Amino acid sequence: MKTFQITRPDETIREALTDKINNLTKPKGSLGTLEELALQIGLIQQTLTPELRHPQNIIFAADHGIVDEGVSLSPKEITWQQISNFLHGGAGVNFLCRQHGFELKIVDAGVDYDLPYEKGIINMKVRKSSRNYLYEAAMTEEEMNLCIERGAEVVRQCHAEGCNVLSLGEMGIGNTSSSSMWMTCFTHIPLELCVGAGSGLDNAGVRHKYNVLQQALDHYQGDGSAHDLIRYFGGLEMVMAIGAMLQAAELKMIILVDGFIMTNCILAASQLYPEVLHYAIFGHQGDEAGHKLVLDAMGAKPLLNLGLRLGEGTGAICSYPIIDSAVRMINEMDNFAHAAITKYF
C-alpha cells in the first residue's frame, strides 16, 4: 500500500499563535471555538497569518455489493442518477458550493454504470461496485491499494491548483452499512448502536439491516488488522476518501470532515496514520444514528448540529463560514497595543 509522511504539526509556533490570539481586542477566550480553530489552522500552516485558498469539495462515488441484501431503502441506480444531478447543478451540494465558493469535483471510484466522463467526471473507477461482504471481502488487496493511490492522486491535483482546504463527500447507496461496520470494528461500540436508517429505512428495515450486518461480522475470518477490516467491509469510494485524507494531511491541508460516512472514513484513516486527525475539522453532527457516538469516541468537537443526513459534503461546507471567521479573526482584529486599549486581564 502507498505510504504517507504524516507528522503532527510542529508545536514551536503554538506559543506565538496563542499570544497573538490572546492579545486581540477581546476578553481572553471570549471568541471560543473561533480561537481554537485559528490556533489549529495556524499550527497546520505554521504561520501567524493563516489563509484559506481555493476551497474544493470532492465527491467520491461508488456502488456497494451489500445492497443486494436489502440494507438500503434506495435502489443502487440512485447512485448514478444523483451523479447526473450533480452534473446539472441541481443537488444539495451544488447550491452550497455556489454559495460558499467551493469548486466541486466528482470522482467515479466504482459506480456500477458507464458514466459520461466527457462531462467532467473524474474517472478513477477501480471496478463496478464493491463485492457483497456478507459472502466475501468487498475488495481485493490490489483494489484497496488502487483506491488509496487514486484518492491521493486527486488530492495532489487539488493542491497543485492552489487548494489548501478540502471538503470530502460521497455518493454511494449502501455506504452507511460499511460505515457502521468500520465504526463497530474500530470503536468496539455494539453494532446495534452503529446502525441507522440511512436513506430512510423504517424500524423493520433498520432491524433487517442490523441482522444482515451482524451476519457479515460473524462470518468475517480475516486477521482483524485495520488494513484488513478496511478492505473487507469498505466501499470503494470510502477507501478512496481515506487515500485523499491521508494525502491531504501529508500536504498539510485542512480536512473538513462531513457526516457519518466521512467521519468513519477518517476514523479508519486514523487507524493507519493517527496523526491525520491533527488536520481534521469536524463540520457537523448529523442525524444518522451512531454519528454522535463515533464523534464522542474520537473526542471530536463538531461545529454544527443541523439535523443533516444527506452526505455529499454538505455539512462540511455549511461549517465553512465559521472556519473563515476564525481565520479572519486572527488576521483582521486589532491588538490591544495598536488600538491603544488597556489590556484588562
From Swiss-Prot:
GO MF, one example: nicotinate-nucleotide-dimethylbenzimidazole phosphoribosyltransferase activity
| Keyword vocabulary terms for this entry | Cobalamin biosynthesis, Glycosyltransferase, Transferase
HAMAP family to which the protein is assigned, alphabetical:
CobT
What's this protein's family per the entry? Belongs to the CobT family.
- Tell me the SUPFAM superfamilies matching this sequence: Nicotinate mononucleotide:5,6-dimethylbenzimidazole phosphoribosyltransferase (CobT) (SSF52733)
Q: Which organism is it from?
A: Bacteroides fragilis (strain ATCC 25285 / DSM 2151 / CCUG 4856 / JCM 11019 / LMG 10263 / NCTC 9343 / Onslow / VPI 2553 / EN-2)
Asked whether the UniProt record includes Transferase among its keywords, one would answer: yes
Q: What's the protein here called?
A: Nicotinate-nucleotide--dimethylbenzimidazole phosphoribosyltransferase
Q: Which Gene Ontology biological process is one annotated for this entry?
A: cobalamin biosynthetic process
Would I find Glycosyltransferase among this entry's keywords? yes
Q: Which Gene3D superfamilies match?
A: 1.10.1610.10, 3.40.50.10210
Record's catalysed reaction(s) = 5,6-dimethylbenzimidazole + nicotinate beta-D-ribonucleotide = alpha-ribazole 5'-phosphate + nicotinate + H(+)
Phylogenetic lineage: Bacteria, Pseudomonadati, Bacteroidota, Bacteroidia, Bacteroidales
Q: What class of enzyme is it?
A: transferase
Task: Please list which residues make up the signal peptide.
Answer: none
Q: Where is the active site?
A: 312
Gene name of this polypeptide? cobT
The protein's role, per its UniProt record:
Catalyzes the synthesis of alpha-ribazole-5'-phosphate from nicotinate mononucleotide (NAMN) and 5,6-dimethylbenzimidazole (DMB).
To which pathway does this protein belong? Nucleoside biosynthesis; alpha-ribazole biosynthesis; alpha-ribazole from 5,6-dimethylbenzimidazole: step 1/2
What Enzyme Commission number(s) does the record list for this chain?
Answer: 2.4.2.21
